[in-house]
């Protein structure tokens, strides 16, 4: 139960990608439907059964993450001008309502990588999840139509 809740929170954090807009081929544009290809929380692999039922949708400055039938919605704010690129995710509806998570992201074609700090205390500085932290590292693949 605790693992499922952490998974929901984690996925809904990553759903936190900000206003992308613009050229869909730009590495700064993260609009689309994204499915987690792999993920780890606190340095440990994320449960496969949860990964398979998770979906992140980003549309402009809005996100929606669904884990099974548990939706989480909110807004994202991107800062692509810094390295690594930054993402602020704020929940507006669901289990993360009124919570803000700081993250970093990078996109390469149809692959999006996001590292979230689920403690909500600081922004990750690298794409790494280590034991004893609440860092959630997810590699997403864009869902094809």
Language model feature labels by segment:
Residues 35-51, 59-126:
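Contiguous, well-ordered beta-strand patches that form the walls/edges
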Residues 20-35:
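N-terminal helix-cap/turn-to-beta initiation motif at the start of protein domains
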Residues 131-145:
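C-terminal partner/receptor-binding element of secreted or periplasmic proteins
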Residues 30, 45, 124, 141-142:
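Preferential activation on post-signal-peptide N-terminal prodomains/segments
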Residues 5-15:
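Bacterial N-terminal signal peptides
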Residues 22, 41-42, 139-143:
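Chalcogenol-based redox active-site neighborhoods
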Residues 1-2:
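N-terminal secretory signal peptides that target proteins for export/translocation
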